[in-house]
Amino acid sequence: MQAPLSGLKVIEFSHMVMGPCAGLMLADMGADVIKVEPIGGDKTRRLRGAGAGYFPMYNRNKKSIAINLKSTEGKAAILKMIKEADVFIENFRPGALDKLGFGYDDLKALNPRLIYCSEKGFLDGPYSHRTALDEVTQMMGGLAYMTGPPGRPLRAGSSVIDVTGGMFGAMGVMAALNERHSTGKGKYVSAALFETTVFLVGQHMAQKSVTGTPAAPMPARVSSWAIYQLFDTKDDEQVFVGVVSDGQWKILCNAFGLEHLLEDSELAENRDRVIHKDKFLPQIVEKFKLLTKAELMEKIENLGLPFSPIGKPEEMFDDLHLNAGGGLLDMEMEDGERCKLPALPISFDGERLGLHLDPPKAGEHTVELLQKLGLDIAELKSKGII
């Protein structure tokens, strides 16, 4: 399969997660993405703890050039690349690239067809000067409030705003590229962490508008469904089960010897069952507790009802479905070790997007890329430019 974005040329000035994620989306779909790094490499490479996975996860299928952008020759080399590029992606603080001569106005003058994508903390407005982080905007935009129990705001269990913000940036880039087919002109595209967070909690804002009551944090919420929770099993494990229709309710009751519940008029519809949980939930808890995790999941799956074990990230490496369907990409890390990481969750005509470049070593493609520009590699090295 020819990748959908094959032939697209992208220059990426980014670090951490949001900008690299936007570049990853385009790279996985076939774009030729060149990651521009300082001498010594992007500092994201050296993060530890919770940040140790950022670089390998969000920088596959890219080429790396490490160069001194503050030098006249280094800057000129990258500008030469940008002149022939389709897309430029950056996620630095406001004004940082303008000082280096890589701001939107500078690059628009150089390449009027360029799509310039800025991944920011905030879109235009009173907060746009602020420095933001994923966790800052999760707290600020209401997501942390909705995730933790009352009085204990809690960030989501991944860099969900960075990743989603990167996705919105990539979406904006592709829309601008489509528009360019008719206008012949580039465009400035921006996505931001704060606005991304607010978009994700939009359902709770709408709930307040519809009901007149503010949404409660998820651990304290009143579920829309009568059965939509974790259940303990015989072997002290847990399984989530959701019953979201009257038809599923009948299937559950018949399968677990609870036919008498179907005769109760107060339990006939989901909205009634939400009110009268005390009449049936203890009985379901008791029935499920008689089965092991494996037994309960097998039975629920055979019934066609929604269910899930409580998975951990490290368990996904060996997941049967992911491995069978091309959902994991086997790649070589910077230290030479191999690792399977999630593919982009999209298929085209049933085919998954694959790996064509391992996460690059810092400056791995510097010589290759500069030679294409006809530059003197030895001279650049002697001057410390690369």
Language-model region placement:
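Glycine-rich beta-alpha junction loops
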Residues: G40, G121-L123, L193-V198, D235-E237, ...
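Mid-domain beta-loop-alpha active-site segment that forms a flexible
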Residues: S159-M174, L193-V201, V244, Q248
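N-terminal helix-loop segment corresponding to the beta1-alpha1 unit
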Residues: M1-G172, A176-S182, K361, V367-I386
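Conserved PLP cofactor-binding pocket of PLP-dependent enzymes
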Residues: E301-G325
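Oxidoreductase and adenylate-handling cofactor-binding alpha/beta cores
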Residues: A144, G166-G186, F199-T211, C253-H260
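Conserved Rossmann-fold dehydrogenase catalytic segment
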Residues: P150-S158, H181-T197, A216-S223, S265-A268, ...
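Flexible, small-/acidic-enriched active-site or ligand-binding loops
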Residues: M333-K381
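Aromatic-enriched alpha-helical interface/lid elements that frame and gate functional surfaces
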Residues: I227-L303, F307
